[in-house]
A protein has these predicted regions:
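Primary recognition of N-terminal secretory signal peptides and signal-anchoring hydrophobic helices
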Residues: 2-15, 20-199, 226-230, 251, ...
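Short, conserved, GDST-rich strand-edge loop motifs in beta-rich repeat architectures
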Residues: 155-160, 212-221
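N-terminal secretory targeting and juxtamembrane "stalk" segments of secreted and cell-surface proteins
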Residues: 195-203, 214-216, 241, 353-354
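An acidic-aromatic
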Residues: 216-237
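Blade-loop segments of beta-propeller domains
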Residues: 233-250
Length: 389
């Protein structure tokens, strides 16, 4: 399993997450009074991206553009053009810096910088070490490797001026409206590893639906997923689960006006006030202790995917019966056998092209699509919902 941290190489690359100490960024090749420009990139776990702008090493201190630092440290940014100042907002923290000034403020308290923020090619650069240490992150410097290690602490999601942070190691959930510091409002049950950001949707006045998802590990086969419903700063409900596999998480998130909360074995649909409108015990329905993805839902039926086998399932809400789709539609026997064999092999990386996909329902007739393995032709198959009884 690769390191979950990001690493910065001053000579070539900036690989990173977030962690800080008061170590000076000096080395034999860089004089302390020099200003050096270094093209860099960012690596998070097994993902690498090149930074558009070079980093600056000035008097042994590393400076990055405001947006890069705020992105790495999960901070919100407010720029005041009149005063040429930038304010960064994070969890229980406010940092203010001014272009060209060595005077900064952390939580309204005056602090003196080693190097001031500076303008380079229309971009404002600010000192990385100062900002990171202000939010209690510790950066370690390896002289021999010329690398800085910066582990990630928070994931962030924003929608309509509302920001949420999740502390990865504890699941603590924080909230801030507009240009404010983040304050704790509750917890999510899952502890995440490498997640950088997550989705936030404003579903009603003061009500937000949070959706979290991450893949990690050597092949990205370890997965965490979760959901939370927040109204007026209060967590109304939340759920999550962890699982392993090559296949994507195909769970839907909303059905009409309701949102989904699931742990992979139970599913419930809530309205905007957190009232449960429907609840299903998926493992009881199927009489199998597996993880199930909810791919479609209405008052008549539900489409599930058994994650380990990738078999598609139709559940008739009225008759309270469930069937495997491949057993009911008119697939050639050879194709059924292929699906059955693939479903039995827990280590098989099933070809995503060759699984059954729900298409639509018209007048009670459901249609599905499947690409045959024998000729790679996509065919359409039908199933009458009344047969699921």
């Amino acid at each position: 399993m690769p390191s979950l941290s990001k690493k910065i190489s001053v000579t070539a690359i900036l690989c990173g997450s977030i962690f800080f100490s008061a170590t000076e960024f000096t080395n034999e090749a860089v004089a302390k009074n020099a200003k050096v420009y270094v093209q860099a990139g960012v690596e998070s776990a097994d993902q690498y991206s090149q930074l558009k702008d070079p980093i600056i090493i000035d008097q042994g201190r590393i400076l990055l553009p405001i947006r890069d630092i705020s992105d790495q440290l999960s901070l919100n940014v407010q720029w005041n053009q009149k005063t040429k100042s930038v304010t960064l907002y994070g969890v229980n923290k406010e940092i203010k810096l001014t272009l060209g000034s060595i005077t900064a403020y952390v939580d309204k308290k005056k602090v003196t910088l080693d190097v001031p923020p500076q303008m380079e090619k229309s971009k404002i650069y600010i000192p990385l070490q100062f900002v990171a240490s202000s939010v209690k992150q510790k950066v370690t410097w390896d002289r021999s490797l010329k690398e800085i290690t910066i582990p990630r602490t928070y994931a962030k999601g924003t929608e309509n001026q509302m920001t949420y942070w999740i502390k990865l190691s504890t699941g603590e959930l924080y909230q801030a409206k507009g240009n404010q510091i983040g304050t704790k409002i509750g917890n999510v049950s899952n502890k995440f590893k490498t997640m950088k950001d997550f989705q936030v949707e404003n579903i009603a006045a003061g009500t937000y639906y949070l959706r979290m998802n991450e893949n990690y590990g050597m092949s990205g086969t370890s997965r965490n997923t979760g959901q939370a419903l927040v109204k007026n700063g209060k967590v109304l409900d939340e759920d999550s689960f962890s699982f392993m596999g090559y296949y994507p998480d195909t769970t839907l998130h909303k059905s009409h006006a309701n949102v989904l909360m699931t742990n992979g074995k139970k599913a419930r649909f809530l309205d905007k006030n957190g009232v449960v409108k429907a609840e299903y015990h998926l493992t009881d329905m199927m009489q199998k202790d597996e993880i199930y993805m909810v791919e479609h839902y209405n008052q008549r039926f539900m489409i599930l995917r058994e994650y380990a086998s990738q078999h598609l399932i139709v559940y008739n809400v009225q008759s309270e019966q469930a069937v495997y789709v491949h057993e009911m539609i008119s697939l050639p026997e050879s194709e059924k056998d292929d699906l059955e064999q693939a479903g039995l092999d827990r280590n098989n990386e099933m070809e995503r092209d060759h699984i059954i996909i729900f298409d639509r329902i018209i007048d009670g007739i459901m249609t599905f699509q499947y690409k045959n393995k024998s000729d790679n032709v996509v065919n359409t198959y039908t199933l009458d919902l009344s047969q699921v009884r």
